[in-house]
């Protein structure tokens, strides 16, 4: 699906979508338990993949209405699925479900689309093997299809922290229902650490204890997933909020602003986007009690940013840098190359196609703002929702019309993205 966006000015109120990261974890936590109601979940292609996995393990998922799902879980004992589990394009589903599947007595096979089958899972599979489960890649390259199972009981394991924090999340969530629990030693610096903070925060809401140790984490075994009052409320998604904030900062009307609802504080590292835009000269006001962000247009100046703990913000920051004056230098971004696509290369290529001056290095992306004016053209979404949404924001400030391919991929995390842009006044034409 192509979407065409013309240079536009925006203003008005819009509600942030629920957090994808919290929704994935809440669904799986409810599956590990007896039952739970999830309030304000994100219903998207990725989170529906996690719901189907819960059902494959013997749980049930009922959509009560658009704001509630009720999950009956499998009480820490997933059954062996009767068929493969198709995780589609969701790396989070694959990794979290791989550790869950390793608790089953039999074997589970996980696969997904072409993009997912290129993503690395080797360290998690090796950890499962160390814990006396079965974890292997059918191609023996650490990539899906994956085979997991043999009911691992817990123990001690060492794992790198600089490839994906989802490995740690997967082991913590599964470890709570093992016999022995799991002690995790980090072999490297933990990148994307706020995502593990999200996990620890959510597990606490489900009455599951995690201990931070000198060299990693420990989760005692034999625990039960029991949320307070049987419910869990999903907060707004700051990864998605970043695009709405950027839209206001670069394209709000002279007498207006973009106001974003549902932006309550949480453990999300991507809430750093507020401070980043402020550092670039943006005037972002955050009413934390009301959960509202207000951002008018501003003249932005390039800054230097380390995205080691907020990889999903790289496309947004790169777009802001292309519109700002001066250089925006994005450091510590090698791990951002291992997402749905190589996001470092994709943003360098597509912003370059729009006329931006960009320098790409292995662990760094520099956007030389102010050297050229962005111009509308045909750009590729690279099958990646975050690339698509970031390019859409660039299109708001570009001369002429920009057409973005693969635009249907916003369904992964922000299904109503283009409707939200239109509601704010952007010129959006969807070609289905």
Curated annotation (Swiss-Prot):
Its main location: cytoplasm. The active site is at 312 (proton acceptor). Keywords: Amino-acid biosynthesis, Aromatic amino acid biosynthesis, Cytoplasm, Transferase. Pfam families: EPSP_synthase (PF00275). 3-phosphoshikimate binds at residues 20-21, 25, 164-166, 192, 312, 339. It is an enzyme of class 2 (transferase). Its EC number is 2.5.1.19. GO terms for molecular function: 3-phosphoshikimate 1-carboxyvinyltransferase activity. It comes from the Archaea. It catalyses: 3-phosphoshikimate + phosphoenolpyruvate = 5-O-(1-carboxyvinyl)-3-phosphoshikimate + phosphate. Pathway: Metabolic intermediate biosynthesis; chorismate biosynthesis. It is found in: Cytoplasm. One of its GO terms (biological process) is amino acid biosynthetic process. One of its GO terms (cellular component) is cytoplasm. PROSITE patterns: EPSP_SYNTHASE_2. Phosphoenolpyruvate binds at residues 20, 91, 119, 166, 343, 386. Catalyzes the transfer of the enolpyruvyl moiety of phosphoenolpyruvate (PEP) to the 5-hydroxyl of shikimate-3-phosphate (S3P) to produce enolpyruvyl shikimate-3-phosphate and inorganic phosphate. Belongs to the EPSP synthase family. Monomer. This is 3-phosphoshikimate 1-carboxyvinyltransferase. It comes from Haloquadratum walsbyi (strain DSM 16790 / HBSQ001). The gene is aroA.
């Amino acid at each position: 699906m192509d979407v065409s966006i013309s240079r536009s000015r925006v203003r008005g109120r819009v509600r942030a979508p629920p957090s994808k990261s919290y929704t994935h974890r809440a669904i799986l936590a409810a599956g590990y338990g007896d039952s739970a109601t999830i309030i304000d979940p994100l219903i998207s292609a990725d989170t529906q993949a996690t719901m189907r996995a819960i059902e494959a393990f013997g749980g049930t998922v009922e959509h009560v209405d658009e704001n509630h799902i009720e999950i009956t879980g499998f009480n820490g004992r997933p059954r062996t699925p009767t068929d493969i589990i198709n995780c589609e394009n969701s790396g989070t589903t694959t990794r979290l479900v791989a550790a869950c599947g390793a608790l089953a007595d039999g074997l589970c096979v996980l696969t997904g689309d072409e993009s997912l089958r290129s993503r690395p899972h080797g360290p998690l599979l090796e950890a499962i093997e160390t814990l006396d489960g079965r974890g292997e890649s059918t191609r023996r390259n650490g990539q899906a299809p994956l085979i997991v199972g043999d009911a691992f009981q817990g123990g001690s394991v060492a794992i790198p922290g600089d490839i994906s924090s989802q490995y740690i999340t997967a082991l913590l969530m599964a470890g709570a229902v093992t016999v022995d629990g799991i002690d995790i030693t980090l072999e490297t610096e933990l990148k994307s650490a706020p995502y593990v903070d999200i996990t620890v925060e959510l597990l606490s809401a489900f009455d599951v204890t995690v201990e931070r140790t000198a060299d990693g984490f420990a989760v005692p075994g034999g625990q039960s997933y029991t949320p307070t009052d049987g419910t869990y409320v999903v907060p707004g998604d700051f990864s998605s909020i970043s695009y709405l904030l950027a839209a206001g900062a670069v394209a709000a009307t002279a007498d207006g602003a973009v106001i974003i609802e549902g932006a309550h504080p949480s453990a999300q590292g991507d809430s750093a986007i507020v401070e980043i835009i402020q550092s670039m000269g943006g005037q972002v006001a955050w009413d934390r009690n009301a959960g509202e962000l207000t951002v008018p247009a501003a003249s932005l100046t390039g800054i230097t940013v380390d995205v080691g703990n907020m990889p999903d913000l790289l496309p947004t920051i790169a777009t802001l840098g292309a519109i700002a004056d001066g250089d925006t230098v994005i450091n510590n971004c090698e791990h951002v190359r291992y997402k749905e696509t190589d996001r470092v290369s994709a943003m360098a290529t597509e912003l370059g196609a729009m006329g931006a001056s960009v320098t790409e290095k292995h662990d760094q992306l520099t956007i030389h703002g102010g050297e050229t004016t962005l111009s509308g053209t045909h750009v590729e979404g690279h099958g990646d929702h975050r690339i698509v949404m970031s390019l859409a924001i660039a299109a708001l400030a570009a001369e002429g019309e920009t057409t973005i391919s693969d635009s249907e991929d916003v369904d992964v995390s922000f299904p109503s993205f283009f409707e939200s842009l239109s509601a704010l006044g952007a010129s959006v034409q969807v070609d289905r």
